[in-house]
């Protein structure tokens, strides 16, 4: 059995060996036990004639206990009494007095029970038996009570006396309760008090009812007739106490019980009662006010409740008071109660009996129920400070003692035995137990021993040596062993040995010391923003033999994932908290635990964010509104762990701008009030927003609205301008005042104007709109202008004078060009002379320079002109034109402009010199053999001059030699060049440049070689699909891989399933073909596919055709001869013809849109090469047009179209006799007499770049 050591520690706190009784585990010995009272009746019993009376007295002991009783100190024999039944149960001396004999009065008295055996006598406490008869109200004659209206009266109850508590009810003859209030109430004594009577109190049936719970009966007093004499002159009087009647009284309250104080007063008007405790505050948590404040109940009275309690009765005429002086006393209570013990011979026995009470109780001792004074004087005892001490006890000293404490409020009795016994030592802890603990902790090995005398206990290690030589080992008085600061080498076996004068015994305890749990990486404290997520990480090391776990706590509460919320995510030692809120901040701890230990690592999470709303926004100092001021104050906002930097004060005017807030300014974050300067006539509603480093928080609740008084404007409009929109007017404009600057419900503007410098009388007009049109002015004349704000309270300040002008006309003069300086082939400088300002007819705003490309110097463009513009400031008379095309003609115009528009233009034409060409287009490499490559290219889009040829250079990328080889190709019409003697094992970098007289231009670069460097050719992404009688093999040719031929062989499996005549024959295929379709296969048949070259297997595949089984393949013809196929092809051809006719009809309708027109809007004739990533197929104009008409159709099914990249594909390129090129690579004859046909099949298509849809580049 393995014991976890945290369960052991409470056992170490038990008393050592000397127990109240012999342990149950101590078996195998016949041990006697002195008498012990186990149950007895309460100290006071109140019984009634019909009740059965049971007096209980039960006790245990060995040998069997005998019982005897005394009544009023005289021996009482229950068995000999008539009507008494003795209980014959074991361990019981109880008896019952039966209630049907009405003998209760005869058995009244004080009883005591004695339980005895050979070892002593135990004694019960005194039991007082009180017998009551049936309650009866004494016969009396009740006289009517007469009283004048407004006077006080007391209706007495005087119920019969009773030993048991009773309840009093006042009712009338209809069994309705008398209504009680501050004027009418019942006292604790049962009397009914009237502070003053009213005529409505006049009744003849006031009945006092007494309820006796013991007899379960209610008896009534004779009805009282209350007669109230009406009066017309009720006299007010001050309060007088009806109970108690004197000014003060003294009471004794018992500690731990309740104290009830009562004051009932009379007077008119009806007095009110309140209670005072002059010396100390009233203990409100223990005070209950009842009966309309006339009764004070103080619960659980303590010594601190000593003192004066005053009741005060008050009305409008005066007051009356009564002082209760309360003394708190106490019945005896235990400080230390004597306990029974077992002792061995020769030991000293000590029984402590410490009691307390007020007054101090008297303590007496008894031995076996007899007063200690009557015991033989040779007993070895003494009494010291209330304790009974016996020295050198022997078995004959076994006894039962009684300690009794008594004062006037009660008595206490305790039985305790001294049992002197000789018992052999015995270890009650199980033998061979295993204990586990972790390194660094404290282990507790149990050894519970019992015997008399008390056994001595020692612990030994495996070698029989005492363990106490190590200071880490410490014994407990009860025999257990503690080992602090455990180490791994403490693991082992330990022996506990217990011995007394009769024997010695030994048990084995096994200790296993495990590795302590350690947190290797604990969570770290962090600061996160509200709404973010935080991750805490925890890693720990555990003893591998223990079951371990990692849990998380937040502020001491266990955290777990919840199915209805994703707030927490816990996995693999991580705690993730999502959507952080301020309530999430606190301490988070990782708890790594095993069944032996647990360690905890804490981290603090601080959630920060923008502040909370500003509370308690208040307005004050309203008298300042007349001066357009107000005082605003607020309480600090919750800063959410980031200091508040400032408060933003905003206002809203719900009349002029509802739901729009304007800032009045900001104050420092440590300021919580400010006096605001306000504008006249604004309906201010304020709010305040706190701001910290994380931004503004929620605004405060809005304040109440205040309105400032109206006033004359304090500002005039700004940005006053005078400009004409016609040649004979002037439009005066200004920026209107904001509504908050109106200072009144409405605003107008007083506008004044006059010609500048003529000192004429000001003309004026008052308007509401923010503009005024002055008509019939001369062209471009200066005016003085003033604009002043006006409202119903007066005018604004004197406005400033602004100079404006009437309308402008178009400039009448063109700039005179001075010269044009050519910087280089793409940049020129244009200069002109300043214009005459008098001819500008307005403010000279600048110059507009317009220029456009007219065409190459070889040939002018006929397409749409695209013009470029440049605006030059008025103080500048030159412009640099850059980004021009080399070797081109340009037209330039310069115009002056004012606010009205542009004037006449000065024109000039210039040409740019020749430049270097752009890079050639579409350089491609085609492998001819292992040592040769054919290079294809297209001329550059931008010649920038006259092409003189091409410069080709290349060098190997690998190998030792990096020598650059150059070829100067002087034929500008050349489009291909063949390179030989290349190394098949190397890759090359090829660079091609076009040249003009200015030199080579930008290069186009490609890298490649003749063959793959290693192994077999690469069939990238090769795949195979199958139908019922065909299969398609597809692959992606690798760029730079030489084209080569190989054959594909389909072989049916298993062999023999298909006859040799029906086996497909090997077919030759080109690598660049990228796919191959094998027809005439058998359905539902598996085929092996071999790709072979010169008997070398290049690739191996397998495929299975669809269908239900082999079919006979026709040897007379293919499916192309079937009727359905012929009809299908005919339908397609007919559809294509219809589409072609529709296309020609459409082209003929738009015939005016020729290739020439389209080229004018897109490209120069120099820059219309046809290109494709696979070199492009150049055809005659007619064939090109035909291809474009069917550019989107699929190839025919007869397989006659030759795939791109085949061995014969070069025949389709530039060698065609129908194709002619001019010097820059464009087609000769594109504009020669076939315009309509060209328009029908020209560059209209928006399809992708291809040999039949060439890309068009704009120059």
Swiss-Prot record:
Pfam families: Bravo_FIGEY, fn3, I-set, Ig_3. Isoform 2 is predominantly found in the brain, while isoform 1 is found in the peripheral nervous system. Residues 1-19 form the signal peptide. Residues 712-724 have a biased composition (Basic and acidic residues). Residues 697-724, 1182-1209, 1228-1259 are annotated as: Disordered. One of its GO terms (biological process) is synapse organization. Keywords: Cell adhesion, Cell membrane, Cell projection, Developmental protein, Differentiation, Disulfide bond, Glycoprotein, Immunoglobulin domain, Membrane, Neurogenesis, Phosphoprotein, Repeat, Signal, Transmembrane, Transmembrane helix. The modification Phosphoserine is found at residues 1165, 1180, 1183, 1196, 1245-1246, 1250. One of its GO terms (molecular function) is axon guidance receptor activity. Interacts with SHTN1; the interaction occurs in axonal growth cones. Interacts with isoform 2 of BSG. Neural cell adhesion molecule involved in the dynamics of cell adhesion and in the generation of transmembrane signals at tyrosine kinase receptors. During brain development, critical in multiple processes, including neuronal migration, axonal growth and fasciculation, and synaptogenesis. In the mature brain, plays a role in the dynamics of neuronal structure and function, including synaptic plasticity. This is Neural cell adhesion molecule L1. It comes from Rattus norvegicus (Rat).
């Amino acid at each position: 059995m393995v014991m976890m050591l945290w369960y052991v520690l409470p056992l170490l706190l038990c008393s050592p060996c000397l127990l109240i009784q012999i342990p149950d585990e101590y078996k195998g010995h016949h041990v006697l036990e002195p008498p012990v009272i186990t149950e007895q009746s309460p100290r006071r019993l109140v019984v009634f004639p019909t009740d059965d009376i049971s007096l209980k007295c039960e006790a245990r002991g060995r040998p069997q206990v005998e019982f005897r009783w005394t009544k009023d100190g005289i021996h009482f024999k229950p068995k000999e009494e008539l009507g008494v039944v003795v209980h014959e149960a074991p361990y019981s001396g109880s008896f019952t007095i039966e209630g049907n004999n009405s003998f209760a009065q005869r058995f009244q008295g004080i009883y005591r029970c004695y339980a005895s055996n050979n070892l002593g006598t135990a004694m019960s406490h005194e039991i007082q038996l009180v017998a009551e008869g049936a309650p009866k109200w004494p016969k009396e004659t009740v006289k009517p009570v007469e009283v004048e209206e407004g006077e006080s009266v007391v209706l007495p109850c005087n119920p019969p006396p009773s030993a048991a508590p009773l309840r009093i009810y006042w009712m009338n003859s209809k069994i309705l309760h008398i209504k009680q209030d501050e004027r009418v109430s019942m006292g604790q004594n049962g009397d009914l008090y009237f502070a003053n009577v009213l005529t409505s109190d006049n009744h003849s049936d006031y009945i006092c009812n007494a309820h006796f719970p013991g007899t379960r009966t209610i008896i009534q007093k004779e009805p009282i007739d209350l007669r109230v004499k009406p009066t017309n002159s009720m006299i007010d009087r001050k309060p007088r106490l009806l109970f108690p009647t004197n000014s003060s009284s003294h009471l004794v309250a018992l500690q731990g019980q309740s104290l009830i104080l009562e004051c009932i007063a009379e007077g008119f008007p009806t007095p009110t009662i309140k209670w005072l405790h002059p010396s100390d505050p009233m203990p409100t948590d223990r005070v209950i006010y009842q009966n309309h404040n006339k009764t004070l109940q103080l619960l659980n009275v303590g010594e601190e409740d000593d003192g004066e309690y005053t009741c005060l009765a008050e009305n409008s005429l005066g007051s009356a008071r009564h002082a209760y002086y309360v003394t708190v006393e106490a019945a005896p209570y235990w400080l230390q109660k004597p306990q029974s013990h077992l002792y061995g011979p020769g030991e000293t026995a000590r029984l402590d009996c410490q009691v307390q009470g007020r007054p101090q109780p008297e303590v007496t001792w008894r031995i076996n129920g007899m007063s200690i004074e009557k015991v033989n004087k040779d007993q070895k005892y003494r009494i010291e400070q209330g304790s009974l001490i016996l020295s050198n006890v022997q078995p004959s000293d076994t006894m039962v003692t009684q300690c009794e404490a008594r004062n006037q409020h009660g008595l206490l009795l305790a039985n305790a035995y001294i049992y002197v016994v000789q018992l052999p030592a015995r270890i009650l802890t199980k033998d061979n137990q295993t204990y586990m603990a972790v390194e660094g902790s404290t282990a507790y090995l149990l050894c519970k021993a019992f015997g008399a005398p008390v056994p001595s206990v020692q612990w030994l290690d495996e070698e029989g040596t005492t363990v106490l030589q190590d200071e880490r080992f410490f014994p407990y008085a009860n025999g257990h062993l503690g080992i602090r600061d455990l180490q791994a080498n403490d693991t082992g076996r330990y022996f506990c040995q217990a011995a007394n004068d009769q024997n010695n015994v030994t048990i084995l305890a096994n200790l296993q010391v495990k590795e302590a749990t350690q947190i290797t990486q604990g969570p770290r404290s962090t600061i996160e923003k509200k709404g973010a997520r935080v991750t805490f990480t925890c890693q720990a090391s555990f003893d591998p033999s223990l079951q371990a776990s990692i849990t998380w706590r937040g502020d001491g509460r266990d955290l777990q994932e919840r199915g209805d919320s994703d707030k927490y995510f816990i996995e693999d030692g991580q705690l993730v908290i999502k959507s952080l809120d301020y309530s999430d901040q606190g301490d988070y701890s990782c708890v790594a635990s095993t069944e032996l230990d647990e360690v905890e690592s804490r981290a603090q999470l601080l959630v920060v964010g923008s502040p909370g709303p500003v509370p308690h926004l208040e307005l004050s100092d309203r008298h300042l509104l007349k001066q357009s001021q107000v005082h605003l104050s607020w309480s600090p906002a919750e800063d959410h762990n980031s200091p508040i930097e400032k408060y933003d004060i905003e206002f809203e005017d719900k009349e002029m701008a509802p739901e729009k807030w304007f800032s009045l300014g900001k104050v420092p974050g440590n300021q919580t009030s400010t006096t605001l300067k306000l504008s006249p006539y604004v309906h201010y509603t304020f709010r305040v927003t706190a701001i910290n480093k994380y931004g503004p928080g929620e605004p405060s609740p809005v304040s109440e609205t205040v309105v400032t008084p109206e006033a004359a404007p304090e500002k005039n409009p700004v940005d006053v301008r005078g400009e004409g929109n016609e040649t004979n007017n002037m439009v005066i404009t200004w920026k209107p005042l904001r509504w908050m600057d109106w200072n009144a419900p409405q605003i107008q503007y007083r506008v004044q104007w006059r010609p500048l410098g003529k000192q004429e009388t000001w003309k004026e007009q008052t308007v509401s709109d923010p503009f005024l049109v002055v008509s019939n002015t001369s062209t471009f004349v200066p005016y003085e202008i003033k604009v002043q704000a006006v409202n119903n309270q007066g005018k604004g300040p004197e406005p400033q004078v602004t100079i404006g002008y009437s309308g402008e006309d178009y400039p009448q003069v063109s700039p005179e060009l001075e010269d044009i300086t050519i910087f280089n082939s793409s940049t020129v400088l244009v200069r002109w002379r300043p214009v005459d300002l008098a001819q500008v007819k307005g403010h000279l705003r600048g110059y507009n320079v317009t220029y456009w490309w007219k065409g190459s110097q070889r040939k002018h463009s006929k397409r749409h002109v695209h013009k470029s513009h440049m605006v030059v400031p008025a103080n500048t008379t030159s412009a640099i034109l850059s980004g021009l095309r080399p070797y081109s003609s340009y037209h330039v115009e310069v115009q002056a402009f004012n606010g009205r528009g542009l004037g006449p233009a000065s024109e000039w034409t210039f040409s740019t010199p020749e430049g270097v060409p752009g890079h050639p287009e579409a350089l491609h490499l085609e492998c001819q053999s292992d040592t040769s490559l054919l290079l294809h290219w297209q001329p550059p889009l931008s010649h920038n001059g006259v092409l003189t040829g091409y410069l080709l250079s290349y060098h190997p990328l690998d190998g030792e030699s990096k020598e650059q080889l150059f070829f100067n190709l002087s034929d500008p019409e050349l489009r291909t060049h063949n390179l030989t003697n290349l190394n098949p094992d190397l890759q090359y970098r090829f660079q091609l440049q076009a040249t003009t007289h200015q030199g080579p231009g930008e290069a186009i670069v490609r890298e490649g070689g003749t063959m793959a460097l290693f192994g077999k050719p690469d069939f990238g992404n090769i795949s195979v699909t199958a139908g019922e009688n065909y299969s398609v093999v597809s692959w992606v040719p690798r760029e730079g891989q030489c084209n080569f031929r190989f054959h594909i062989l389909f072989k049916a499996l298993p062999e023999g399933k298909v006859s040799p005549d029906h086996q497909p024959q090997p077919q030759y295929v080109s690598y660049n073909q990228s796919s191959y379709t094998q027809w005439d296969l058998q359905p539902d048949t598996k085929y092996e596919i071999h790709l072979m070259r010169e008997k070398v297997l290049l690739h191996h595949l397998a495929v299975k055709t669809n269908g239900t089984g082999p079919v006979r393949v026709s040897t007379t013809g293919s499916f192309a001869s079937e009727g359905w196929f012929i009809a299908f092809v005919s339908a397609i051809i007919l559809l294509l013809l219809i589409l072609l006719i529709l296309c020609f009809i459409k082209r003929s309708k738009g015939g005016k849109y020729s290739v020439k027109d389209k080229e004018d809007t897109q490209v120069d004739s120099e820059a219309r090469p046809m290109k494709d990533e696979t070199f492009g197929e150049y055809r005659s104009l007619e064939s090109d047009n035909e291809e474009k008409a069917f550019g989107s159709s699929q190839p025919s099914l007869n397989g006659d179209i030759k795939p791109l990249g085949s061995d014969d594909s070069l025949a389709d390129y530039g060698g065609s006799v129908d194709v002619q090129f001019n010097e820059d690579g464009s087609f000769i004859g594109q504009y020669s007499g076939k315009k309509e046909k060209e328009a029908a099949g020209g560059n209209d298509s928006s399809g992708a770049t291809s040999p039949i849809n060439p890309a068009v580049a704009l120059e």
